[in-house]
Amino acid sequence: MTERSIFDAAGGAAGMTRIADAWHQRVRADPVVSHAFHKGTKPDHIDRLAAYLGEALGGPPRFTQQYGEHADVVRIHSGNGEHDEMNERAVDCFRGALRDAGITDPDTYQAVLDYWTWATWHPMYQFHGSPDDAPAELPMPHWNWDSTVSH
């Protein structure tokens, strides 16, 4: 029997969209994290984030089929210098977004939060010196219930 994915436990594509929308609303209102969005976002930012999050949590490969590669996302988040406070606040916003999106099962909540925290502090922050430091190809990480990544 196949174990249920985190993606499915969090509500599938609709759940990912609720999470992405709630996070987007929270970070746009946060006085520190909103700085990352001061130049605006793509009109489909919420859908892109939902697709990316879904793929990383065991859903279909919608992000890589429609929008780009993991390396593209890492480069977008690279070269911004050290910003520990922004990362901490972004994770706090995500905690609230999970609640706003109705993720009430404790195991699902924790699994999604653990992924987001790992992604915030590792691949999205790893190349804070320059986006040119990010490799051209990086496999999409796939998070599981054991809080480990496979590619």
Where are the language model's segments positioned?
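Surface/interface-facing alpha-helical segments and adjacent flexible terminal/loop regions used
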Residues: 6-9, 103, 136-139
